[in-house]
Structure formats: structure tokens, C-alpha cells
Amino acid sequence: MSDILDKIITVKREEIAAALESAPLEELKVQASARDSRDFVGALRDKHAAGHAAVIAEVKKASPSKGVLRKHFVPADIARSYAQHGAACLSVLTDERFFQGSARYLEQARAACALPVLRKDFIVDAYQVLEARAMGADAILLIAAALDTPLMIDLEAYAHSLGLAVLVEVHNRGELDEALKLKTPLVGINNRNLRTFETTIDTTLGMLDAIPDDRIVVTESGILSRADVERMEAAGVHTFLVGEAFMRAENPGAELARMFF
């Protein structure tokens, strides 16, 4: 299979160049300064303190590998359902070309509930970090496979200066070594290889011994059943980012509760 990640990054750079023309930095800074902030990391820790799994529930219409996951897609309704059934935070896809996401979806989901929201996208430039704050995100995703370490460190520092939490995502030990140079406590292990889109939850289990105890491990992708959840919890993983299993269910929030609570 061709390298999907490289294709996505190329498109992102084209999108940034176009966005700079339509929404200059100064305009975004004004929008960003008007946004309130919700404590993303704190919401996860509160769930842990209460003895519960911390679920980052994803609002995702489609993916490159699976196509459309949910035809009746109303972000506000999905967000409310997640909040009512015990989610700690939301993750909203804002990539349009590959995941049929939108900044509007993030705004709609955040307005519908009180949960902190992660902007799920392929961030390669500081402009996108500011853009995330302007659209109302409380956290951003930094993907180690898409960034060199100095840039990742710079983007994290900029995000923190704007009041954004950072989830750094890795898929292998080499990426983990670089990700641990960041300050964020949130380390996501993506069970899906972004270059091939092959998925196995053994990816998370095989990397746990290399992660310091002061980091919060977030297992991402491939968590599709209660059995998957129990396997992770038995290994000491209590923070999950889940999208597909919920999106395919008739009631996303009820499926969250069934799998986790």
C-alpha cells in the first residue's frame, strides 16, 4: 500500500498555504483569545481518581481505510450522548479531505456539552495550533511519525502557551523515545500504523514497559469490544481513545457505557 501518511502531510501543507490567505494569523489570534479553556488532562485524571476508565470519545464520520462509518452524523447529538454516558473528553476529526471532518463539527460538539475537546488532525505547522485554539479546541494531537523532534517540541511549547493540552502519538519505540522528550504527560500509542493502516492492539501492550510511570498512556485505535478493554485494563492501561466502535453503533454513548462501564 502506498504511504498514506505522506499523502496526508502533503495535502496539509497545501491547506495551510491556502488558509493563511483566507484567515491571516492576526485574525486567528483575535478568535483564539476569545475562547474559554477546559482542562483536558484534568478531566482524564478525575476519571482515574474515581476508579473509572478515562474515555476520549471520538466524533468521526469516516476514515480512509473504512470509508463512511456513520451516515446519520450529527456532531452535537453524538457529543451529548457521549457526555451522558460517561466520556471524559471528546476527540473531533477536523481533517476534511481524508476523514470528512470539519472545524464546524468541533465547534458544534463542544457547544453541545461541557467536555474538553481534542482537535484530531495532522498538525505540521504552528498555524494549525493557533487555528485549533480559535475553533475552540482544548487539546491538540502531535503525531511523532509526521514531525521531527525539534518541531514537535516547538509546537508543544506554542500549544501550551495558548492553554492547549498536547497528546503526543507514537506507533513504535523509536517514536516513543522522541516523544518522551516532550513535557506533556499524555502519550498516545496508536495501534494503527499510519503508513499502512494495519491495526493490532498488541502495539500498545508491547511498549508499556518503556513508558515512565508519570505519563498517562492513551491507547488509540482497534479497541472494538469489552474484551479489548479488559485486556488493556489488565495491563494497567486506563485511558482510551475510541471512535469506530462507537460510530458504528446505533447509540454511540450507550455503546461507550456497554464497553467501559
From Swiss-Prot:
Highest taxon, organism lineage: Bacteria
Catalytic reactions of this protein: 1-(2-carboxyphenylamino)-1-deoxy-D-ribulose 5-phosphate + H(+) = (1S,2R)-1-C-(indol-3-yl)glycerol 3-phosphate + CO2 + H2O
GO biological process, one term: L-tryptophan biosynthetic process
InterPro entries membership: Aldolase_TIM (IPR013785), Indole-3-glycerol_P_synth (IPR045186), Indole-3-glycerol_P_synth_dom (IPR013798), Indole-3-GlycerolPSynthase_CS (IPR001468), RibuloseP-bd_barrel (IPR011060)
Matching SUPFAM superfamilies: Ribulose-phoshate binding barrel (SSF51366)
Record's keyword annotation contains Hydrolase: no
GO terms for MF: indole-3-glycerol-phosphate synthase activity; phosphoribosylanthranilate isomerase activity
Alphabetically ordered keywords of this record: Amino-acid biosynthesis, Aromatic amino acid biosynthesis, Decarboxylase, Lyase, Tryptophan biosynthesis
Pathway: Amino-acid biosynthesis; L-tryptophan biosynthesis; L-tryptophan from chorismate: step 4/5
E.C. number(s) listed in UniProt: 4.1.1.48
HAMAP family: IGPS_B
Similarity field: Belongs to the TrpC family.
Protein name (Swiss-Prot/TrEMBL): Indole-3-glycerol phosphate synthase
Gene for this chain: trpC
